[in-house]
Amino acid sequence: MNPKDGAIIQMSFTMTMFPCVKFPQGTKPDYRLTLLTLEDDYQMELSCVKEDNSTVQPTVKMDRNMNSAGEREEILAPSQPMYVVEENFEFITLNINGYDAIIVPKWRGSAGGSTYEFAVDFGTTNTHVEYKVGSGPSKALDITNEHIQMSCLNVDALKNTNILPSIRNNQIPYKLGVDIKFPMRTLLSYKTATDWNQPFWPYITGNMPFYYGSVVNNKFNSLESDLKWNSPEQMVKCFLASIIMLIRNKVLMEGGDLPNTRIVWFYPTSMSMHQLGIISGIWNQLYSDY
């Protein structure tokens, strides 16, 4: 067979990506791409290619289900290397066990320019997020059919009882506002082996577990609940960053005016000035970053 003719090779895996929108000029791109497979002998790598055919290498790669020996912590859960990509790109190149493939995202997003305002109540037990567009009514933060933030290469994977829990526990929700909705428990789900003195990234290291209570947490994750008062600053920042990524994605997907997006957050009068200073500093940093 002439190698130039190509071939069809069957591989058992899927890939998710969010957000599936190109970032406007002046906004720092921030994508999450995840490869998921139940196969033990797959060597998988990806990179992204820009419009000028130059290659974008991921900034970070981490698999929450992989231990220091390179073995899966939870045998029934997939290996799931997740990548951070911080540049716009056109398509993805994928290599599995020496076989190359190209994946072209179906980019979404809308033209617009509407002004969005969000209100975040970071509570001790529950966290609630509402928003309004322009002078419209306020409603709980949602992800609708028209503006789904996450793309899945093989939607049948969303029916796989071994793969689906990892997607629901460690990534943004496919939809938000019906089966799951705000307010939600104030929890951070994170890789148990995390060293919080090292750099961390939302959804790579940890995130708000949107399906908490309806999906069993993965064994390789731990839960932190006392975020508002006694948790390390890095944990609080990771939790809030997982929410602010949802907010930014929503504005971009719906064609909103990102530079003029407003975020209001609340705090109790009983909060000490020291703790208020920490929370305020985290919000200011996240608003600047995103």
Language-model segments: what does each one mean?
Residues 109-136:
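Gly/Thr-rich phosphate-binding beta-strand-loop-beta motif of the actin/hexokinase/Hsp70
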Residues 127, 267-269, 290:
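Active-site neighborhood for divalent-cation/phosphate handling
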Residues 135-168:
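Flexible phosphate/Mg2+-sensing switch loops adjacent to catalytic phosphate-binding sites
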Residues 129, 136-141, 256-257:
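Short, solvent-exposed secondary-structure capping/transition elements
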Residues 49-76:
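Charged, low-complexity interaction regions that mediate assembly/partner binding
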Residues 67-111, 289-290:
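Acidic/polar, low-complexity linker and loop regions
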Residues 1-55, 162-283:
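Conserved phosphate-binding loops in N-terminal lobes of ATP-dependent enzymes
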Residues 134-138, 144-145, 276-287:
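Short secondary-structure boundary/capping segments
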